[in-house]
């Protein structure tokens, strides 16, 4: 629904400035986290690769030190864009983690999250076609593609009008995503304890 509204809005813009993805947002690549393994008994973070973007954090998820740059630490609500391998986007909702290479954390100090999220999403299918054309290497896009990916920026009044519509709905979507993930984690913990016999069902009152 939000995507349709966004597409309809940009299709009907009358006055706008032509820009690019790289000018409306910062695309920060993750690190090769195998170089930042936690030391014994050191606090650590789960490492987010494309598998974790799609399937979530599991007991097989790698860990990294917390001693990494803030730019590659992700938190709930952050926009992620996998630009190599299986190109995809998501809004993160699984807690604090370390971002692995081949995934961008997308941020902006100038434009709202919904704006750069949907503009990046608009170009995703084209990015996938570019990546699919790289037959001799793992499919990916180059950073230069962000520089030539067209973005239409409306006059500020129009942007603010749309912001009043999009922001509450987008925030609700993110909050629901995070709540669903929290409930899923609680369910998995309880199921694990139940399977191990750590929960006595006879003592549970319904």
How would you name each of these model-derived features?
Residues 49, 69-125, 130-136, 142:
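A short beta-sheet element
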Residues 137, 149-150:
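Residues marking the start of alpha-helices
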Residues 1-32, 53, 152, 156-201:
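Non-catalytic DNA-recognition/assembly elements of restriction-modification systems
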Residues 15, 41-44:
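A short, polar/charged loop/turn motif at coil->beta-strand junctions and beta-hairpin connectors
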């Amino acid at each position: 629904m939000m995507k349709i509204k966004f597409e309809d809005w940009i299709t009907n813009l009358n006055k706008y400035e032509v820009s690019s993805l790289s000018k409306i947002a910062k695309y920060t690549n993750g690190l090769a986290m195998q170089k930042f393994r936690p030391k014994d008994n050191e606090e650590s973070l789960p490492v987010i690769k494309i598998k974790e973007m799609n399937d979530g954090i599991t007991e097989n998820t790698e860990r990294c030190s917390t001693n990494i740059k803030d730019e590659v630490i992700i938190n709930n609500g952050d926009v992620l864009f996998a630009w190599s391998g299986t190109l995809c986007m998501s809004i993160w909702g699984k807690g604090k983690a370390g971002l692995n290479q081949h995934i961008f954390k997308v941020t902006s100090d100038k434009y709202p999250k919904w704006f750069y999220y949907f503009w990046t999403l608009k170009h995703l299918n084209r990015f996938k076609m570019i990546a699919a054309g790289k037959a001799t290497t793992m499919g990916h896009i180059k950073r230069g593609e962000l520089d030539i990916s067209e973005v239409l920026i409306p006059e500020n009044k129009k942007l603010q009008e749309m912001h009043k519509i999009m922001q509450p709905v987008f925030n609700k979507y993110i909050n629901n995503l995070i709540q669903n993930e929290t409930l899923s984690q609680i369910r998995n913990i309880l199921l694990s304890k139940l399977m191990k016999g750590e929960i006595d069902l006879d003592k549970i009152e319904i």
